[in-house]
Amino acid sequence: MTKIDLLARVFVIATIIALATAVDYYKLKCPPKTKHTMCIYGTNSHPSRNCGVVKGSGPTDQEKREILKEHNDYGHKVASGEEKRGVNGGQPAAKNMEDMTWDDELAKVAQTWANQCTINHDKCRSVSRFSVGQNLASKSTTGNDFPPVVELIQLWENEVSDFDKNNIKSLPASGISKTGHYTQMVWAKSNKLGCGSIKHHKDGWNKHFLVCNYGPSGNYLGQSVYEV
């Protein structure tokens, strides 16, 4: 086999793999009249013009570690009964909360959505393994730097102040209207995490936009957030 033949065969195999990956997203079930984020924007999307001047796309390796650590540290705090904030008192300890691990596919889908700089949830983001939940946060500053990623996650944690501990065993619709980011963070069955981010300058502000995707998805009405 010549070198050219070998390269051609490698190219064909790579193309087949790429097409298979794209087709997988097309096969996933989405809500009526919606399309999967990866089908709309492709697997190699770039930041939208809507972002303004982009200063950074995607969390750095250090930020990935910080994101994962913050989620797990806070999960430990809640699971051990040390979270004292909340309606009707602090949050009860958890029996079944797992540590989260980083998931590259979730991060890829999250980054594709973050690249759009739209502070709304995308309509379809599931992967073949499970349905996917999502948290969004954006914070701005007029300084030269961008808000640290941990500060964005803490916005979700702070929602616990509005969460009634009596809703842990069966989540009502009212339980996610103000506190859905918090409940997704501590949802016991969500043990995979992947996030995307954009640091951009727009309208005179330095903005840090964070999208975190969680699998399996949490925030199912009528189900327990975690076991007490």
From Swiss-Prot:
Q: Give the range the annotation lists for the signal sequence.
A: 1-22
Q: Which UniProt keywords apply?
A: Allergen, Disulfide bond, Secreted, Signal
* Tissues in which the UniProt entry reports expression: Expressed by the venom gland.
Q: What is this protein called?
A: Venom allergen 5
Where does the SCP domain lie? 69-214
Its source organism is Rhynchium brunneum (Potter wasp)
Pfam families (UniProt xref): CAP
Family annotation (PROSITE patterns): CRISP_1, CRISP_2
- Cite a GO CC annotation: extracellular region
> Where in the chain are disulfide-linked cysteines found?
30-124, 51-117, 195-212
As for subcellular location, the record says: Secreted
Main location class:
secreted
The UniProt similarity line reads:
Belongs to the CRISP family. Venom allergen 5-like subfamily.
